[in-house]
Amino acid sequence: MQVQKSFKDKKTSGTLYLVPTPIGNLQDMTFRAVATLKEVDFICAEDTRNTGLLLKHFDIATKQISFHEHNAYEKIPDLIDLLISGRSLAQVSDAGMPSISDPGHDLVKAAIDSDIAVVALPGASAGITALIASGLAPQPHVFYGFLSRKAGQQKAFFEDKHHYPETQMFYESPYRIKDTLTNMLACYGDRQVVLVRELTKLFEEYQRGSISEILSYLEETSLKGECLLIVAGAQVDSEVELTADVDLVSLVQKEIQAGAKPNQAIKTIAKAYQVNRQELYQQFHDL
């Protein structure tokens, strides 16, 4: 067990700060984020050129260290050594929250394993920002990040998740969004979705409707900018009628194969299909 008192403990090691950056509008940069970036010894940036423009805008002279998915495992030991020596680091992504669809998570784990304090600053996050304005149920929700580019893997993913009652969120390229929606329609049926693009920018747009309606709209409209797709969860009532024809134990096993612990997998499937969790637990362990 580990207890971190972020601002009370007196340690010789430095602190790792996770600093969110604007997702499109520079006015969303917080006073605390600017102050932190000025005070730390180094900034670990996903793209030093992109972050350099941000630093210049806010008159921040702190030295940058390149840290991205292609050099993360090589750089992490050196960054941990800096933190152990007493230097403080800030990690930023190109836009939004660090660790969300970028390599920050591995650095955070390494810092925690080395008993180094990790402090996250609140700020811009595309998923939550879009979700609360989408009109779809904000809780429960689940964020999956970027989908596979391969149609077969994407369809298999949707088949596994089609029964989930949670609102689902994905990042997607404007060049692949029509193919993704087509695959989703085949697996999920014609659910309500919200397609969000250019979030916080001048041309911010929310497209709300069924999957088929959005697909029809996209046939006549070109898309630019990264997209965020928010999808309504499965309707519980319609799913309950199907439980007699569904092998719930197999679904539990799929969840476990995907990385879930057995008890969590049982809980997820029991909730999705509105069955007694203890009974499903017994079925699973009787095999």
Curated annotation (Swiss-Prot):
Name of a matching Pfam family: TP_methylase
Subcellular location: Cytoplasm
EC number: 2.1.1.198
Main subcellular localisation: cytoplasm
Catalytic reactions of this protein: cytidine(1402) in 16S rRNA + S-adenosyl-L-methionine = 2'-O-methylcytidine(1402) in 16S rRNA + S-adenosyl-L-homocysteine + H(+)
GO molecular function, one term: rRNA (cytosine-2'-O-)-methyltransferase activity
Domain of life: Bacteria
Keyword terms: Cytoplasm, Methyltransferase, rRNA processing, S-adenosyl-L-methionine, Transferase
One cellular-component annotation, GO: cytoplasm
UniProt-listed HAMAP family: 16SrRNA_methyltr_I (MF_01877)
Similarity comment: Belongs to the methyltransferase superfamily. RsmI family.
Primary role: Catalyzes the 2'-O-methylation of the ribose of cytidine 1402 (C1402) in 16S rRNA.
Protein name: Ribosomal RNA small subunit methyltransferase I
Source organism: Streptococcus pyogenes serotype M18 (strain MGAS8232)
